[in-house]
Amino acid sequence: MQIDNKIFLVSGGASGLGAATGELLVKAGAKVMLVDLNAEAVAAQAQKLGCRSVVADISNEAAAEAAVKATVEAFGGLNGLVNCAGIVRGEKILGKNGPHALASFSQVINVNLIGSFNLLRLAAAAIAETEADADGERGVIINTASVAAFDGQIGQAAYAASKGAIASLTLPAARELARFGIRVMTIAPGIFETPMMAGMTPEVRESLAAGVPFPPRLGKPAEYAALVRHIIENSMLNGEVIRLDGALRMAAK
């Protein structure tokens, strides 16, 4: 599917992977709606890129529905969704303060998994109403997992579970939506330079980068966005999880 003049919704669009994806899509000629919970940041990013933005908690049914509706009303349809929104919470199953809090586990699952699926199902319904191209393709949905889905570390029970579920969702979703001409793919990034890393010291960042076989550095959001572009443009990519990690395999801790 060509990107030019196509319509995309990007969650987590205010910063990091989502912001880089939105920027690439706009530069490629797409009509883009950024969605984020941070109203000020997403509005500023949209103004910078010259696209649209909407504020929404993607785990909320009504809010996500409103975001998809706003996109369709603004641009006249929908061709793609890139789910980049997510949170990280580190907590041991049995820590110094006792068992893992159920509330924090639920929060991570709610944002990362429920939020992604919420937008996926709503976007799929909107994309299914879009006119198919000559090959019968209507659109593509790209979710974001993590290498933690496969190499979850100690303290990542909630995060790894949420991302593992997204990885597992990929194939059944792709199979089910194939009859509508909708592809579903997932990217599982390694360690990237995002706001989630901002609180780490230079020493910690260097240590993490040294663990990547090649290139021995943190990934750049633009590299994630470049893979998004390739997935959109290569119609044979469907139902697969692609690790984007420089051959990184996370240690237990």
Residue ranges of model-derived segments:
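Canonical Rossmann dinucleotide-binding motif of NAD(H)/NADP(H)-dependent dehydrogenases/reductases
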Residues: 2-32
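The beta1-alpha1 cofactor-binding region of Rossmann-like NAD(H)/NADP(H)-dependent oxidoreductases
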Residues: 39-40, 56-67, 102
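Catalytic Tyr-X3-Lys loop
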Residues: 87, 98-118, 142, 159, ...
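Conserved mid-core segment of classical short-chain dehydrogenase/reductases
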Residues: 87-106, 125, 129-135, 155-158, ...
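Alpha-helical segment proximal to the catalytic Tyr-Lys
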Residues: 125, 174-176
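Residue(s) in the substrate-gating loop at a strand-loop-helix junction
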Residues: 146
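Short, small/polar-rich loop/turn modules that mediate ligand/substrate recognition or access, typified
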Residues: 178-183, 237-240
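C-terminal substrate-recognition "lid" of short-chain dehydrogenase/reductases
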Residues: 220-244, 249
